[in-house]
Amino acid sequence: MKAELIAVGTEILTGQIVNTNAQFLSEKMAELGIDVYFQTAVGDNEERLLSVITTASQRSDLVILCGGLGPTKDDLTKQTLAKYLRRDLVYDEQACQKLDDFFAKRKPSSRTPNNERQAQVIEGSIPLPNKTGLAVGGFITVDGISYVVLPGPPSELKPMVNEELVPLLSKQYSTLYSKVLRFFGIGESQLVTVLSDFIENQTDPTIAPYAKTGEVTLRLSTKTENQALADKKLGQLEAQLLSRKTLEGQPLADVFYGYGEDNSLARETFELLVKYDKSITAAESLTAGLFQSTLASFPGASQVFNGGFVTYSMEEKAKMLGLPLEELKSHGVVSAYTAEGMAEQARLLTGADIGVSLTGVAGPDMLEEQPAGTVFIGLATQNKVESIKVLISGRSRLDVCYIATLHAFNMVRKTLLKLENLL
């Protein structure tokens, strides 16, 4: 099956926003075994949009349009597609009810007539409910070509795709089953080298490596009759892959941490904290609260996290955490001493089971004769205080902070897994 993605919105063409939906949708289609052959961006213009739809319909089996479902005059995706298909627009009852519920809590004047457009679908289409917004999506097949309309905001598009479109397409088209393995602590080039014979000789299942910021994923895919057979084939391949060793002789299984396209080190760590009923706190310097905000983003975070510290300057480390200022000056803020002291004091001051700290040089300049990207991460429990030194070179400030946070979550995760092995 050949698919085409059409992003609708003048703001994409003028560079006001980045079309991240294309990457997300391409990944989702790949998971389903649907080949995306073309990606197009078009402005808010009916004539040009009609031309793009016409071209897509002549060369693709599945046409996915994103954006232009809102209430304003330049939101014309559904109207233009309906015109092309010679279909009327009708109101979806569920979407109308959502509009009623939404505006019932607001001033009557806020419900202008143009808002009703968001509840319209093309006659004969399958509505795709919008869990996080008001504009309903839709799926329709005409003359052997399937068309999908999706909202533009990623916060609305992603839930609609994951919860509505993917299950729908899976029933109709997909025979491809996939499993995503996630790795941290090994680069893509080394992982590909270690698994080169598997990758070069692959048939079915297939192996596709992807480099992410600070980590790597492997997508294992197979075409088979059902999920049970797929699980067996993919499970056998996974076991073979994880039995390999890195170039340093470390078992590849040691740098594997979980499954799933939407998984993360933070999520794995959070779930282990919940599982073992352990609380955590953090004292952050260069990351300025990134570790804590990531942890707090998970529903139920209050089960394991009550609060922590952001101590950017040396003086605040002394003031808020009670670390001796003269010792901080002697050892420097970019040091194992400071990282371990921050972690232990944070743990003691909050009564948490685990204390984590991050201190270092985000860059681009050196600090205390340490190069940019030098990070010390401390971890304190009731029985032990330790730290690791990480060098994240050749990265932007944002990447240094993000990857440092990944290292911190991984350090906590490994500590909790050791606890698991002792139970």
From Swiss-Prot:
The domain of life for this entry's organism is: Bacteria
What Pfam families has UniProt attached to this entry? CinA (PF02464), CinA_KH (PF18146), MoCF_biosynth (PF00994)
Q: Do you know which SUPFAM superfamilies this protein is assigned to?
A: CinA-like, Molybdenum cofactor biosynthesis proteins
Q: Which PANTHER family match?
A: NICOTINAMIDE-NUCLEOTIDE AMIDOHYDROLASE PNCC, NMN AMIDOHYDROLASE-LIKE PROTEIN YFAY
Per the record, the similarity remark reads: Belongs to the CinA family.
Q: What is this protein called?
A: Putative competence-damage inducible protein
Q: Which organism is it from?
A: Streptococcus pyogenes serotype M3 (strain ATCC BAA-595 / MGAS315)
Q: Which gene encodes it?
A: cinA
